[in-house]
Amino acid sequence: MAEYGTLLQDLTNNITLEDLEQLKSACKEDIPSEKSEEITTGSAWFSFLESHNKLDKDNLSYIEHIFEISRRPDLLTMVVDYRTRVLKISEEDELDTKLTRIPSAKKYKDIIRQPSEEEIIKLAPPPKKA
């Protein structure tokens, strides 16, 4: 599934080295410390998760959980969008399934979007100096 590969690449492109350390820390129970040192890129992290059955194209709940507890709503939103668009699992459906651990992920969708014209606060120009 090409969309899955694209999702992982997009996520990898948005994960810095600092982010990676935080993500590895968030799932330290699932990554032995000696393996953690070998994981030095986002793609290596995703590969590790796939090889340990924590991630696949039809089950993204683990990384949704990690992105939420790591306070990365931008990454979480990318995963939720993929799940809704590609897997055709709506936010209502997810409440009835075990495909996600964190059904509250939908709360982040509004954070990422751009405000409408009505929502933009227009400031008055600064006062003129006399």
From Swiss-Prot:
It comes from the Eukaryota. Changing N14R: Reduces MAPK1 binding. This is Astrocytic phosphoprotein PEA-15. Changing K122E: Reduces MAPK1 binding. Keywords: Apoptosis, Cytoplasm, Phosphoprotein, Sugar transport, Transport. One of its GO terms (biological process) is apoptotic process. The modification Phosphoserine is found at S61, S90, S104, S116. The gene is PEA15. Interacts with CASP8 and FADD. Transient interaction with PLD1 and PLD2. Binds RPS6KA3, MAPK1 and MAPK3. Residues 98-107, 122-129 are annotated as: Microtubule-binding. Changing K128 to A/E: Abolishes MAPK1 binding. GO terms for cellular component: cytosol; nucleoplasm. Pfam families: DED (PF01335). Changing E18R: Slightly reduces MAPK1 binding.
